[in-house]
C-alpha cells in the first residue's frame, strides 16, 4: 500500500482487526491519506511503516511504499519491498488476478491461497473522522462503520483461515468468519 492512498487507508482497519485475531502488532502509527487524492478529505488511519507483527499462525509484512505528502509533485519513499515480495506483486497484481489493468493498491497476497485488492469499506463511512471516533464506531456492533469494518475483517480472517488450516479454531470457527468463508471465491 501507500500512505497517500484512500483505499489503503480504508482497508487497514479491517486488516489490522483480522490479523489481530491471530497475533499482535507493535509500532502501528497513526497516519492519513492525502486529502488531495480524495476530494480534499483525508481518511485517518493506521500505518504499517515501522510496525512489526508476530503470530504463531501466520506471517505478515505490511509495506507502505510512499508517504502522504508530495514534494515537487512526488510522494516520499518509505518501504522498499524485498525482491521476493516485489516478484509476487509484479506477477499477481495484474489481470487475470486483479481487475484494474495497471494493478491496484491495497493489494494483499495470502501465501499462495488467495489475493485481494481494493477496499471492502465504503469511504463515505470514514472520511474525515478521527481514529478515536472510528474505533468507537467499530466497537459498536450496531453502527454502520462496525458492520462494514468487521464484515470486511471477517472476509480477510476467512482467507487467513484457509492458510492456517482453520487455526485457531475459536477464530476460524466463529459464526461471522464461517459466514464470510462461504462468500470466498464468489
Question: For the regions a protein language model found, what residue spans apply to each?
Answer:
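Cell wall/extracellular polymer interaction/catalysis modules
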Residues: 7
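Non-globular targeting/processing and membrane-anchoring segments
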Residues: 10-186
Amino acid at each position: 500500500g501507500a500512505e497517500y492512498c484512500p483505499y489503503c487507508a480504508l482497508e487497514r482497519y479491517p486488516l489490522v482487526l483480522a490479523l489481530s485475531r491471530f497475533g499482535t502488532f507493535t509500532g502501528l502509527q497513526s497516519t492519513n491519506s492525502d486529502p488531495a487524492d480524495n476530494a480534499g478529505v483525508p481518511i485517518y488511519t493506521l500505518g504499517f511503516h515501522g510496525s512489526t507483527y508476530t503470530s504463531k499462525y501466520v506471517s505478515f509484512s505490511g509495506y507502505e511504499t510512499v508517504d502522504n505528502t508530495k514534494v515537487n509533485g512526488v510522494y516520499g519513499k518509505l518501504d522498499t519491498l524485498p525482491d521476493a515480495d516485489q516478484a509476487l506483486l509484479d506477477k499477481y497484481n495484474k489481470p487475470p488476478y486483479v481487475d484494474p489493468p495497471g494493478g491496484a493498491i491495497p493489494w494483499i497476497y495470502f501465501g499462495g491461497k488467495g489475493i485481494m485488492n481494493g477496499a471492502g469499506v465504503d469511504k463515505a463511512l470514514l472520511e474525515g473522522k478521527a481514529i478515536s471516533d472510528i474505533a468507537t464506531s467499530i466497537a459498536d456492533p450496531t453502527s454502520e462503520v462496525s458492520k462494514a469494518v468487521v464484515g470486511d475483517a471477517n472476509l480477510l480472517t476467512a482467507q487467513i483461515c484457509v492458510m492456517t488450516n482453520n487455526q485457531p479454531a475459536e477464530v476460524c470457527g466463529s459464526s461471522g468468519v464461517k459466514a464470510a468463508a462461504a462468500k470466498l471465491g464468489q
